[in-house]
């Protein structure tokens, strides 16, 4: 492996999820004795610029986020003969050396199964189920479809109301304002469940319901940002989140990159989500803190 070098183009470092994918990959690379250079991208334009750097420097493999919107970047890497390993979403349309991440549709079904348990525990179900989605991202689209399909299969009589939010509304602040306004026209008894397809929408919706005192609404989401785990510890509004495994994703990305440097393609490496509830959140946080502490020196 001497002389070989791998690039990791890291996107979304305002979220712990991506930070620890990067940190885990760096630690794994160090242990394997291979050079890993981390290039932080702030937006799509910056991401393309970082990919251009990877091509110019002629890295032996590149780890980059899986997004349909950056297909041209994958193609540029492919034309340069650089194997591509994606993390997060498993996108189609390119011959990837490996795709590492969660099945986002399944994450949505896992969240829906927790919502179903909640609904089945009620004496009477009142109101509709709201799904907060950001259609601009295939990751969130897949999660929303998984959630809505699963709810509809179990409760065909329930109204599942998909709310399509723009990118600015899918942040915690944006989603809080959006749900604040949404609830004005939906009095008590009009809504029983709200699902947020990413951390921002889940946290924003939880904050809006909490401030409005709408404790008849149960919140469900995906991801395990610190704010979501705090909401679970409170337990009044946020009932379950489906956590991804950034540490393992980083490890598997680096394992796939090492294989790619040696001429081997590992294909799809799927990692399951972990359901976290108010009852299990303390143990989850303890385990996560232990993993994150070990990665502190490697954070980008």
Residue locations for each model-derived region?
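Immediate post-signal peptide segment of exported/extracytoplasmic ligand-binding proteins
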Residues: 1-6, 30, 119-126
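Hinge/cleft segment of the Venus flytrap/periplasmic-binding protein
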Residues: 2, 132, 139, 151, ...
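Loop/turn elements at helix/coil->beta-strand transitions in domains of secreted/extracellular proteins
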Residues: 4, 33-34, 57-62, 80-84, ...
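Short, solvent-exposed amphipathic alpha-helices that sit
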Residues: 17-34, 107-114, 139-159, 174, ...
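Hydrophobic alpha-helical
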Residues: 48, 52, 61-80, 84, ...
């Amino acid at each position: 492996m001497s002389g070989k070098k791998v690039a990791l183009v890291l996107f979304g470092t305002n979220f712990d999820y991506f930070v620890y994918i990067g940190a885990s990959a760096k630690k794994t690379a160090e242990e394997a004795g291979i050079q890993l250079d981390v290039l932080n991208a702030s937006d799509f334009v910056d991401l393309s610029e970082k990919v251009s750097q990877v091509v110019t420097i002629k890295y032996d493999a590149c780890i980059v986020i899986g997004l349909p919107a950056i297909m041209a970047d994958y193609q540029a890497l492919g034309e340069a003969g650089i194997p591509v390993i994606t993390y997060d979403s498993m996108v189609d349309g390119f011959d990837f050396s490996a795709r590492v991440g969660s099945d986002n549709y399944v994450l949505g079904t896992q969240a829906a199964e927790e919502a179903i348990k909640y609904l089945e525990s009620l004496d009477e179900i009142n109101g509709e189920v709201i799904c907060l989605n950001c259609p601009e991202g295939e990751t969130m689209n897949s999660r929303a479809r998984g959630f809505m399909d699963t709810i509809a299969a179990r409760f065909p009589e329930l109204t599942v109301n998909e709310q399509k939010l723009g990118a600015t509304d899918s942040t915690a602040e944006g989603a809080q304002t959006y749900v604040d306004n949404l609830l004005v026209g939906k009095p008590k008894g009009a809504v029983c469940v709200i699902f947020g397809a990413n951390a921002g929408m889940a946290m924003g919706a939880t904050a809006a319901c909490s401030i409005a005192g709408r404790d008849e609404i149960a919140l469900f989401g995906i991801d395990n940002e610190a704010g979501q785990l705090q909401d679970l510890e409170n337990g009044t509004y946020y009932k379950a989140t489906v956590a991804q495994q950034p540490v393992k994703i980083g490890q598997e990305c680096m394992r796939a990159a090492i294989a790619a440097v040696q001429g081997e393609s590992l294909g799809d490496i799927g990692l399951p989500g972990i359901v976290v509830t108010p009852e299990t959140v303390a143990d989850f946080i303890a385990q996560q803190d232990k993993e994150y502490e070990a990665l502190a020196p490697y954070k980008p």
